[in-house]
Swiss-Prot record:
It is found in: Endoplasmic reticulum membrane; Microsome membrane. Heme binds at residue 439. The gene is Cyp2g1. Olfactory epithelium. The keyword Membrane applies. GO terms for biological process: epoxygenase P450 pathway; sensory perception of smell; xenobiotic metabolic process. This is Cytochrome P450 2G1. Cytochromes P450 are a group of heme-thiolate monooxygenases. This isozyme seems to be implicated in olfaction. One of its GO terms (molecular function) is iron ion binding. It comes from Rattus norvegicus. Belongs to the cytochrome P450 family. PROSITE patterns: CYTOCHROME_P450.
Length: 494
C-alpha cells in the first residue's frame, strides 16, 4: 500500500477515536442525544449491532433503551426510531425537520448527492416536484399507466402459458414484467423478454439489491472511511451501479437524437425539455447528472421492490392455500374469468386488497428504512438532535408494531379487514415510508401489485413443489433489504 494511503488510514483512525470520544462525552454529560449503549473508540457499537442482523439488533436495543435511542456507526452517532408513534412524530409531525437524506456510504461514490433519492435541499425539492408531476401526467395521458400495466401483465400471462405448468423460478419473469412498466414511462418503450441487454440489466439490479443487503454493506456503512481504501465487495456494487448508469446515459443519447420538445414521449424527454429551457442557467438542477441518476432511481426502485413483493406474495399464498382460494373466489365474483382486471375493481375486492397489504406488511422489503437527516438543530421527545444527525426510522418496527397489529409476526389478512369483511386502513401501514420522503412511486406500485396479483390469479393457480407446511418463508438475506428465498413453483392454468 502506498505511504499516502497508509497515512490516510492512520489519520482516519485517530480522527474516528477523537470524534467518538467528543460525541459520547457531550451526550453523556449534557444528555442531548437519546440514550444508547456506550461506544468503543473507532468500533462504535459494533459489539451491540450485528452486521448480519442489524434490524434484529436494533429491536433488542429498543427493549433496553426505548423507542428512541442512539448507536454509533464507527465514530458517527445515528438516532434510531422504533414503532409507529416515534416514526410518525418524526416523519409526519416534524416532517420538515427530518426531511433530509442521511448518509448511504455504499452508494455515495456513485451518486455524490445527485438524483432524486439521495439528494438534499433545493435540489431534492425540485427533482421531487418534477418527478411527481411527470408520473402524474403520464397516469392521465393518452395511454394511462393502468393501461401500460394491463398490457405488460398480458405479455407475462402469455409467457406463463408457454411454460405449461412446468416448475420455474419466478424471479426474472417478475422482474422483467414489472421493469417494463417503468421502462415504458422513463424510456418510452418496453423490452422483449428475450432481449439479452435487458436480461443483463435485470440481473444487475437484482445483484445490486442483494449486495446492498449483505453484511459487508452494513460494515461498510459503519467504517467506510477506512474500508474504502481496501479492495473488496464494495467495488463490486460500485461497478454494478456504474454499468446501470451507463445504460441510462445511452438511453438519454437515443432520446436526444430524435427529440421533439413539442411531443415528449417519456420521462427523459420531459427532463430534456427542462434542460433546454434552463441551458443558460449554470446553476440549474436540470442537468445531465440529475437526469441520469433520477432516471436510475426510478428504474431501480420501480423494478426491484414490486417484483420482490410479488415473489414473497406467491410464496405466502402457496403456504396458505386457503387464502389463495378466497382470492380466486373474489376474482370470480367481481371480475369473472374473461375480463381484464381494472384498478377500480380494488374497491369491490376487500379481501384481495387486505391480502396484498398483509404481504407488504409481513415481508417488509426495506426494514431499516432509508436514512433521514435532520436539516436543523431539532428538539424531539425531550432530546436534542444537532443539525446533520442521521436518523433511521425503522419501517419494519412500524409494520410489526404489536400496538397496531394483533399478530405482528404472522400472516393474518384480517389485520386489514373489519368485522363486516370491509377493507380497514391501518395508520401503521407505512410500506412506502411516510412524510415528505414518502416513495414517489407509491401510486404506481399499488396499481402494479393489485393488477399483477389479480391478473395472474385469474388465470392460474399456484402449485408448490413441497407441502405447504414445508415452505420456508424466511428471508434469504436481511440487511438494507429483505431478500426473498429462491424457490420454484408451477403456474397451473385454471
Amino acid at each position: 500500500m502506498a505511504l499516502g494511503g497508509a497515512f490516510s488510514i492512520f489519520m482516519t483512525l485517530c480522527l474516528s477515536c477523537l470524534l467518538i470520544l467528543i460525541a459520547w462525552k457531550r451526550t453523556s454529560r449534557g444528555g442531548k442525544l437519546p440514550p444508547g449503549p456506550t461506544p468503543i473508540p473507532f468500533l462504535g457499537n459494533l459489539l451491540q449491532v450485528r452486521i448480519d442482523a442489524t434490524f434484529q439488533s436494533f429491536l433488542k436495543l429498543q427493549k433496553k433503551y426505548g423507542s428512541v435511542f442512539t448507536v454509533y456507526f464507527g465514530p458517527r452517532p445515528v438516532v434510531i426510531l422504533c414503532g409507529h408513534e416515534a416514526v410518525k412524530e418524526a416523519l409526519v409531525d416534524q416532517a420538515d425537520d427530518f426531511s433530509g437524506r442521511g448518509e448511504m456510504p455504499t452508494l455515495e461514490k456513485n451518486f455524490q448527492g445527485y438524483g432524486l433519492a439521495l439528494s438534499n435541499g433545493e435540489r431534492w425539492k425540485i427533482l421531487r416536484r418534477f418527478s411527481l408531476t411527470v408520473l402524474r401526467n403520464f397516469g392521465m395521458g393518452k395511454r394511462s399507466i393502468e393501461e401500460r400495466i394491463q398490457e405488460e401483465a398480458g405479455y407475462l400471462l402469455e409467457e406463463l402459458h408457454k411454460v405449461k405448468g412446468a416448475p420455474i423460478d419466478p424471479t426474472f419473469y417478475l422482474s422483467r414484467t414489472v421493469s417494463n412498466v417503468i421502462c415504458s414511462v422513463v424510456f418510452g418503450k418496453r423490452f422483449d423478454y428475450e432481449d439479452q441487454r435487458f436480461r443483463s440489466l435485470m440481473k444487475m439490479i437484482n445483484e445490486s439489491f442483494v449486495e446492498m443487503s449483505m453484511p459487508w454493506a452494513q460494515l461498510y456503512d459503519m467504517y467506510w472511511g477506512v474500508i474504502q481504501y481496501f479492495p473488496g465487495r464494495h467495488n463490486r456494487l460500485y461497478n454494478l451501479i456504474e454499468e446501470l448508469k451507463d445504460f441510462i446515459a445511452s438511453r438519454v443519447k437515443i432520446n436526444e437524437a430524435s427529440f421533439d420538445p413539442s411531443n415528449p414521449r417519456d420521462f427523459i424527454d420531459c427532463f430534456l425539455i427542462k434542460m433546454y429551457q434552463d441551458k443558460s442557467d449554470p446553476h440549474s438542477e436540470f442537468n445531465l447528472k440529475n437526469l441520469v441518476l433520477t432516471t436510475l432511481n426510478l428504474f431501480f426502485a420501480g423494478t426491484e421492490t414490486v417484483s420482490s413483493t410479488l415473489r414473497y406474495g406467491f410464496l405466502l399464498l402457496m403456504k396458505y392455500p386457503e387464502v389463495e382460494a378466497k382470492i380466486h373466489e373474489e376474482i370470480n365474483q367481481v371480475i369473472g374469468t374473461h375480463r381484464t382486471p381494472r384498478v377500480d375493481d380494488r374497491a369491490k375486492m376487500p379481501y384481495t386488497d387486505a391480502v396484498i397489504h398483509e404481504i407488504q406488511r409481513l415481508t417488509d422489503i426495506v426494514p431499516l428504512g432509508v436514512p433521514h437527516n435532520v436539516i436543523r438543530d431539532t428538539h424531539f421527545r425531550g432530546y436534542f438532535l444537532p443539525k446533520g444527525t442521521d436518523v433511521y426510522p425503522l419501517i419494519g418496527s412500524v409494520l410489526k408494531d404489536p400496538k397496531y397489529f394483533r399478530y405482528p409476526e404472522a400472516f393474518y389478512p384480517q389485520h386489514f379487514l373489519d368485522e363486516q369483511g370491509r377493507f380497514k386502513k391501518n395508520d401503521a401501514f407505512v410500506a412506502f415510508s411516510s412524510g415528505k420522503r414518502i416513495c414517489v412511486g407509491e401510486a404506481l406500485a399499488r396499481m402494479e401489485l393489485f393488477l399483477y396479483f389479480t391478473s395472474i390469479l385469474q388465470r392460474f393457480s399456484l402449485r408448490s413443489l413441497v407441502p405447504p407446511a414445508d415452505i420456508d418463508i424466511a428471508h434469504k438475506i436481511s440487511g438494507f433489504g429483505n431478500i426473498p428465498p429462491t424457490y420454484e413453483l408451477c403456474f397451473m392454468a385454471r
